Amino acid sequence: MKFTLFLISALFVSNVSYAAVDPEVAYIFNTFLFIFSGILVMFMALGFAMLEAGFVRKKNTSAILLKNIALYSIAGISFYLVGYSLMYVDVGSYIGSLGGMFYNPTGDELALLDGADNVAAIADTGYSAPSDWFFQMVFCATAVSIVSGACAERIKVWPFLIFAVIMTGFIYPIFGAWTWGGGWLAEIGFSDFAGSTIVHSVGGWAALVGCIILGARKGKYAADGSVTPIAGANMPLATLGTFILWFGWFGFNGGSQLAMGSALDVLAISIVVVNTNLAACGGVVVAVILSQIMFKKIDLTIALNGAIAGLVAITAGPDLQNHFTSIVVGGIGGALTTFAILLLDKLKIDDVVGAIPAHLVAGIWGTLAVGIFGKGDFFVQLTGVLAAAILVVPLSAIFFYILKGTVGLRAVSYTHLTLPTIYSV
């Protein structure tokens, strides 16, 4: 019925004997997968920066670029100091241990670097610990990048960077411990292959809270409820950013196979990559069609967000769907995102780049789709979606309100007209 799934099944049930993979060879290929995929995901930081720079007005370009390079750097240090430990070290049902603070390679790895003859002990772990840390860290940075774009053009830089510390050091790792860290959601069978909820919905919930607390940009919404479009300064740059994100997503999803040491692993990665690509295509096509129907013209910003929505939607289950189903999942993600953009305007929630529709809404849909088209239990998937909201929304609100009441969160009204004050504390 489904040729690609048949191939995977055949590898499991075939009576043909396959030579055992040498542990050292598997270690090398698995580690390479983590490093190469991590580099691709790190390149997505540039994609977010270009996308956001294209969507904001010219006077705010430098500020948004500053936030993007700073948040990536903060994510690296926060995840090194505490985030990785809270997410992966001695995780119980809810949170990891601080005993793994100040991440380091394993003792066997350090011994090998010092000249010990313990290759076998290293190879048996399956991959190098530093490569795993790097791969996980760039995912952490992605989550807070979502907040940056949504809250652009009216949030002060320093308060945002303080929130980035909280997001990458605590909020994201705690939810990650519940899932990828083996906590209570993992125990009940929650499935999120590469992070539709763990990365994108978590970032999307924080972005939604931030946009509500900040309020809209000056002039965006009139008292009578009408919307004044605020055009981005550079749509070619936004389009470039979208293509960079699309490119990097092959590492985001493909690397989440977490192994490349066998023919089965490589086949699975190939299927993940194809499904990822097709879902993005589906998101664009559906968004473009809806744009023509709803607005009587094709809107580039809708198309760009359709691509991202398709990518986000398939991220929860690129390993579980066949190719056609991936197009459906991505297409529905593109449709939901298009409708959500209009809904936000109705609610007067000003999301500069469409991050909330493309990451939160599409992320929720993609997570639930695993329970519809994949092997996940729908109600378990729904539990994971709700758990993300229950954790992220109140914590984000608390910290945003603390920042608002202390150092101040929003640039005062006249600073929308003057770039230097955007940098002010």
Question: Locations of the language-model features?
Answer:
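Structural signature of hydrophobic alpha-helical transmembrane segments
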Residues: L33-L40, A129-M137, S270-A280, F324-G331
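Transmembrane alpha-helical segments of multi-pass membrane transport proteins and ion-pumping complexes
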Residues: M42, L46, M50, Y72, ...
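Transmembrane alpha-helix boundary signature
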Residues: Y80-S97, D117-A121, E153-R154, F175-A186
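Core mid-bundle transmembrane helix pairs that form the ion/substrate translocation pathway
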Residues: K220-G283
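Conserved small/polar residues in nucleotide/adenosyl-binding loops
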Residues: T415-T421
